[in-house]
Amino acid sequence: MRSQQPQNPDLGMKMGKPAPPAGPLKITFGDKSAEWTAATLAALPHKTITVYNEHAKANQTYSGVELIDLLKPLGVPEKPHGKEFRLYLVAEGSDGYQVVYSIGEVTPDVHDGTAIVADALEGKPIGETGPLQLVLTGEKRPARWVHNLVAIRVRVAE
């Protein structure tokens, strides 16, 4: 008798569908929130990173604002410890695509990688996958980068 393989659940993944135009980036943590437009982000200090994009089979250079610099004003700890490691982020693109990150994955004090909200690719504004994109160095799968980034929600695991 052959055992049946369980069916994969519908994860609601919407990859490959066209994304509606991205609006401002809204970041929330508890009752605090902030909105960032491409123009307001452009006025902040930028960091440039080079990552290998498995889909493009090439290194790509992105420039943007370090994510932790956008989270700190909302009270997200820059150097988490103890119970603060219960924090996680849900990043969402304008097409509804979502990726979950632990606070440790996006905090330079914990992780060797860098997380940026990128607004430039190869020195030019990000095209159809922008205007904003969440990019992390050290990620082996670009599917964990969020294109057309419109929301980041910081939550606490129970």
Predicted ranges, named:
Residues 1-158:
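N-terminal intrinsically disordered, low-complexity segments enriched in P/E/S/T
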